[in-house]
Amino acid sequence: MGKVRFIHHRGKPILFLDFSHCNADEVFKTIDEAKQVIRNQPENSVLTLTDVTNTKYNMKTTQAMKELANGNKPYVKAGAVVGIDGLKKIIYEAVTRFSGRNIPVFDDVEKAKDWLVEQ
């Protein structure tokens, strides 16, 4: 299964961005794939769920994530993220500040999906 794919929850499509357990090279590859999918959708239409569980970040991947979140802003109706812990909280804050997006953090994928389909 691909790292970027549509899943369905309560009959609504959610674009799942699976960065879990990715190293830096895999993060860049997943970002490129996400850009292609998201930016070919109608504006203000995409629900995104991003999983960053055990993802390895560095300065370059952090910058790339900021650019992804900012560039996707016109297309994303709502986004949620799971897997934020430790130092990733600092990266998360940088991404949301840079993009100006409100992307809530959830401890559980199911809760994130429930929230997304209500948006």
Predicted regions and their residues:
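Amphipathic, Lys/Arg-enriched alpha-helical "gate/interface" segment within cytosolic domains
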Residues: M1-Q119
